[in-house]
């Protein structure tokens, strides 16, 4: 150990070992360092023990937060006169120096730096700072956790500060979070407090039920068939020779002798009953058909020839109707009567009333002319 250092603690020993060694006079440190609370370092300075401070390690460290106090040992807080409390932060003369009670309240000292206020009528609070305003008079009118505000009682009316998800004068209305219809694909929206949830139908998932579940994820199709996902369903595109929902069925192989003349594509076979006299053979008495009479209907609907026939028939019908209407209108404008007993193409005038205007009326069929207006051949006037 270097000369001139007398250490009484293990901490100081570690300090000495870590410090660089240099020659120091023995009386440079020991003469002024408080060796009860520290030790001399090789550089001649005092190294204080934990809880002590100062140039010579002569001062203890107070409790953190101690305001008006001192210590005799480390981490103490001994209050000065007139102060109290754990941190010596409470004034024992609080009611005499400057009363904390407001609005005319009376301060009562309880000892240990504590006090209480006796408030006048109409006021309350620790320091009589609150007035019995609209909130107190209404008796906590705000609902669903709302906070009543009346400017500490000095406002004329109160207001309710509502929590998220509620509205109204007293926070009594729960906001309908399903009003905007956030759930998709026919899902049911369940309203909550400032939130909603979607009850998804089968085949959908997600917060808004927008995810179509993959029904092909479990690989339901057999025989190596390709799966096509649908809404809560799937289709299997089966290879040739297989059928069924999951291609689990093996289709029978058709007889080439009976299907050689059948065109490709899906067909519907219908057996046509025989008509006319039926030849009988001796013994059996059954119908003998050498060639099967089969009618096959393609699924494509009308053929091209049938569609053309329908269009031509419609055009001819429309032309005939239009021609008949035009001819009838033309004959009516020229005064030509069609064959029939109810039309008189030209009016008749009496000889004595020629060159005068007359009202023309149509006579019923078979009605004779008046005797004073006999018809005069060659004396007619066209309309």
Swiss-Prot record:
Keywords tagged on the record: Calcium, Disulfide bond, EGF-like domain, Glycoprotein, Membrane, Repeat, Signal, Transmembrane, Transmembrane helix
Cytoplasmic compartment segments: 328-383
Extracellular side: 27-306
MF GO annotations: calcium ion binding; identical protein binding; Notch binding
Residues carrying sugar: 157
Gene Ontology cellular-component annotations: membrane
Membrane topology reported for the UniProt record: Single-pass type I membrane protein
Highest taxon, organism lineage: Eukaryota
InterPro entries: EGF-like_Ca-bd_dom, EGF-like_CS, EGF-like_dom, EGF-type_Asp/Asn_hydroxyl_site, EGF_Ca-bd_CS, Notch_Cell-Fate_Det
Cysteines joined through disulfide linkages: 29-40, 33-46, 48-57, 66-71, 79-88, 95-107, 101-117, 119-128, 135-148, 142-160, 162-171, 178-189, 183-198, 200-209, 216-227, 221-236, 238-247
GO biological process: negative regulation of Notch signaling pathway; regulation of fat cell differentiation
Predominant localisation class: membrane
Cleaved signal peptide residues: 1-26
EGF-like domain boundaries: 27-58, 62-89, 91-129, 131-172, 174-210, 212-248
Subcellular locations according to the entry: Membrane
Cross-referenced Gene3D superfamilies: Laminin
Transmembrane portions of the chain: 307-327
Chain's role: Regulates adipogenesis.
Protein name stated in the entry: Protein delta homolog 2
């Amino acid at each position: 150990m270097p000369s001139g250092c007398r250490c009484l603690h293990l901490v100081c020993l570690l300090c000495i070992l870590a410090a660089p060694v240099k020659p120091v006079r023995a009386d440079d440190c020991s003469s002024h360092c408080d060796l009860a609370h520290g030790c001399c370092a090789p550089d001649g300075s005092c190294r204080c023990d934990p809880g002590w401070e100062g140039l010579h390690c002569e001062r203890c460290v107070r409790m953190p937060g101690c305001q008006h106090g001192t210590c005799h040992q480390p981490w103490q807080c001994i209050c000065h006169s007139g102060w109290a409390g754990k941190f010596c932060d409470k004034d024992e003369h609080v009611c005499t120096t400057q009363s904390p009670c407001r609005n005319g309240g009376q301060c009562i000292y309880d000892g240990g730096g504590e006090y209480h206020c006796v408030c006048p009528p109409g006021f309350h609070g620790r320091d009589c700072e609150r007035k019995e305003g609209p909130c107190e008079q209404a008796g906590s009118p705000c609902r669903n956790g709302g906070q009543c505000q009346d400017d500490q009682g000095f406002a004329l009316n109160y207001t309710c500060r509502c929590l998220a998800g509620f509205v109204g004068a007293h926070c009594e209305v729960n906001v309908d979070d399903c009003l905007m219809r956030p759930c998709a694909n026919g899902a049911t929206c369940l309203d909550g407090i400032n939130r909603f949830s979607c009850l998804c139908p089968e085949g959908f998932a997600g917060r808004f039920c927008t995810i179509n579940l993959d029904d092909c994820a479990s690989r339901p199709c057999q025989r190596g068939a390709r799966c096509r996902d649908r809404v809560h369903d799937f289709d299997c595109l089966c290879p040739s020779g297989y059928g069924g929902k999951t291609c689990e069925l093996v289709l029978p192989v058709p007889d080439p002798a009976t299907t050689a003349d059948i065109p490709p594509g899906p067909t519907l076979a219908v057996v046509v009953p025989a008509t006319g006299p039926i030849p009988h053979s001796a013994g059996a008495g059954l119908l003998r058909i050498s060639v099967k009479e089969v009618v096959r209907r393609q699924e494509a609907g009308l053929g091209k020839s049938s569609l053309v026939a329908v269009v031509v028939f419609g055009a001819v019908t429309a032309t005939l109707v239009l021609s008949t209407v035009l001819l009838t209108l033309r004959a009516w404008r020229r005064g030509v009567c069609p064959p029939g007993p109810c039309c008189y193409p030209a009016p008749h005038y009496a000889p004595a009333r020629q060159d005068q205007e007359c009202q023309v009326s149509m006579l019923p069929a078979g009605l004779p002319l008046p005797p004073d207006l006999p018809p005069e051949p060659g004396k007619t006037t066209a309309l």
